[in-house]
């Protein structure tokens, strides 16, 4: 908080270890804001005069789009959960009760078989606690034998998977794949130390975390270790490229909007500051160059064997397409099965619906080709 003239500033969340969203001040003397916490997104509040941060809403779900009545006695928001695509709810400001105002997807959901994820908590090699989820494959409970598994990695890296609805993950589960998704170090929702756990070294602690999740899944589920895939988009695409340079445990990979070379990416992507802050400097400084190179998958591409599909939008300014082209060429020149599908007039955060449909089918075909898991429908 600050005075209208900008003076008298007070940090109301100085002792709070999460990232507050956009603040809204209420007549009752509180500042309301939402934030992500351990895979969920909820509403919080703190007194204007200072005090403890209080969580207002609860549950294993993600809430967004909060709006408030003029007197702040009531609020409305959108809620989504792993088997609920999202609807609008209203509640008193205390959130003691809530009323569902819409059932936009009720008719569609009634026709679908949706799958409930199981929460996982496991330790990385250095003892760090990591959270993840396993979405069981269609027929897993009733069937015997081992199932193929796909490790899905989020973007960011300062993002968060959790208790929201994902069409892509549900589709993979419906096609017979176990779907593992985790929040490795650099994810939000677990405190500042965790959020900056990859600072200066992408591909190290985060890699250890996701692979610890893979080992945990193998120990606790019927996983066919010869039919495992790995995929991600943006930072998740980068981490996919990194994973295939570090291990041959995966039978196939799909790298979406992926980075392979942090030096060539510098100053051509639309967020150059990320490289300087995350890797300790620009490439013309020795320290920055050292960290940029050591975290670049292209530098470690010798010996990669994992068949990999690359998908990328041609006008992606966040992750320019030449980043994926470099990794594709590195694999192709080594005789590794690789395919590149590029989409015109498609940027980082938006594709036309039909291009999204095409990408979905291309990816399913790749998984079927290398993991051979699509069940008879």
List the model feature ranges, each with a label.
Residues 26-28, 70-71:
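Residue-level detector of Asp-centered blade-edge/turn motifs that repeat once per structural unit
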Residues 1-27, 35-36, 46-64, 92-117:
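Multi-bladed beta-propeller domains
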Residues 8-12, 42, 55-56, 100, ...:
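Conserved beta-strand positions that form and line the central face of beta-propeller blades
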Residues 181-377:
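Active-site-proximal cap/loop segments of hydrolase catalytic domains
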Residues 31-34, 74-78:
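Residue position within the beta-strands of beta-propeller blades
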Residues 95-97, 102-227, 231-234, 260, ...:
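Cap/lid segment of the alpha/beta-hydrolase catalytic domain
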């Amino acid at each position: 908080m600050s005075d209208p003239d900008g003076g008298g500033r007070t940090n109301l969340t100085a002792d709070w270890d999460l990232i507050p969203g956009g603040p809204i001040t209420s007549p009752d003397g509180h500042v309301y804001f939402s934030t992500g916490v351990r895979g969920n997104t909820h509403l919080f509040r703190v007194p204007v005069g200072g005090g403890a941060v209080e969580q207002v809403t609860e549950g294993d779900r993600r809430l967004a789009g909060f709006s408030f009545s003029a007197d702040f006695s009531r609020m409305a928001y959108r809620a989504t959960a792993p088997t609920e695509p999202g609807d609008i709810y209203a509640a008193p400001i205390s959130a003691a009760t809530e009323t569902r105002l819409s059932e936009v997807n009720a008719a569609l959901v009634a026709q679908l078989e949706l799958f409930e994820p199981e929460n996982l908590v496991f330790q990385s090699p250095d003892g760090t606690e990591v959270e993840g989820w396993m979405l069981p494959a269609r027929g897993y409970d009733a069937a015997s034998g081992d199932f193929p598994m796909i490790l899905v990695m989020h973007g960011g890296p300062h993002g968060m998977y959790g208790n929201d609805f994902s069409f892509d993950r549900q589709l993979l589960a419906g096609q017979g794949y176990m779907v593992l998704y985790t929040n490795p170090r650099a994810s939000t929702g677990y405190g500042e130390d965790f959020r900056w756990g990859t600072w200066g070294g992408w591909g190290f602690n985060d890699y250890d975390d996701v692979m610890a999740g893979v080992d945990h899944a193998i120990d606790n589920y019927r996983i066919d270790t010869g039919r495992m895939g790995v995929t991600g988009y943006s930072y998740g695409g980068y981490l996919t490229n990194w994973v295939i340079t570090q291990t041959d445990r995966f039978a196939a990979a799909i790298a979406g909007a992926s980075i392979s070379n942090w030096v060539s990416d510098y100053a051509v992507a639309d967020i150059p500051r990320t490289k300087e802050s995350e890797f300790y400097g620009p490439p013309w400084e020795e320290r920055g160059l050292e960290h940029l190179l050591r975290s670049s998958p292209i530098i470690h591409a010798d010996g990669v064997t994992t068949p990999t599909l690359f998908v990328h939008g041609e006008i992606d300014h966040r992750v320019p397409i030449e980043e994926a082209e470099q990794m594709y060429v590195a694999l192709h020149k080594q005789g590794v099965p690789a395919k590149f599908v590029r989409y015109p007039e498609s940027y980082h955060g938006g594709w036309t619906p039909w291009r999204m449909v095409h990408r979905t089918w291309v990816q399913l075909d790749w998984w079927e080709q290398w993991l051979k898991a699509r069940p008879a429908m």
